[in-house]
């Protein structure tokens, strides 16, 4: 997400290009912008990156404001941001994982399969009940699971609402201009004043003075690497066998009786546990806590935690926040093999723990093509020792982790 607002003069095109370029770190498959042309609010959505979109939109620099988005396309070909609903314009980062249940609970039906559509609907729904803007946002956060970091433009009430339940949204000022970005680095690198992280709601007054909202959405690319839509087929489901297993397991490590060479003693403990020799002496947690002390920053982020959304990294993030009391930024490298479930877990964990999530996305088309080549090459002469070829594409993970540390000024990353 990026945005610039100025009521006195037109926006600086070079600043917009810079913000659009930094936004592309989250993906270049799809982009969208909203800006003012004469008396109308113009929304343009395309299936390429934000910098290219800005370059092909010649009249954006005549506007006094612009807000945009750049994203990775994983399972939907639609250029879905910004979202327009109830005369509200929303640009959203994150995933609302329980959006279908919420639609059912409020007795309304979605027009699209997009979870972000729910944000303006809920904002309008609770506003009509007479709630204040702060209470409306709190209600949205209370019923939604997953990350919500969004710009919500309410042109009829001349308001720009910044909302975030995990801190992945920042704003700053320079002279008469107001700037917004998903991360702090683009704003601090522009030497803005008062760069602030959003938790909850921050509202900015802006006089839009418009007639109508125009939407220009064009899809030109056919993407054959997206996740197929799940379709339940009862005829195929009947072919599946789901036998109930009653396996004997080790009382300590839960290894099953199907494990090669396993035996159990009279207490139900396996031979692997009985013969295990401790390789080192675990130190108490207090030692780890003392190692963290020099890195702690009261009230600000103090470490980077690489985060895939899997079981191990999710538990690790929980320990770092809840047990060690650190204030991390979760860093995710999406290289084409992060699953849809992984992305949803990332959204759930970061919202629950109120952890900012910085996402760096690869060129998915190229990455998946390389993965296919590596797997094909391995299959010609399969060997267990060479199976690491399958994950060769994720090694940029380490490089971008160092970039994130430099941009945030954080020297510690915890694995």
Where are these regions (language model features)?
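Generic amphipathic alpha-helical segments used as scaffolds and interaction surfaces in large
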Residues: 7, 93, 128-131, 236-241, ...
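ATP-dependent adenylation/nucleotidyltransferase module used to activate substrates
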Residues: 247-415
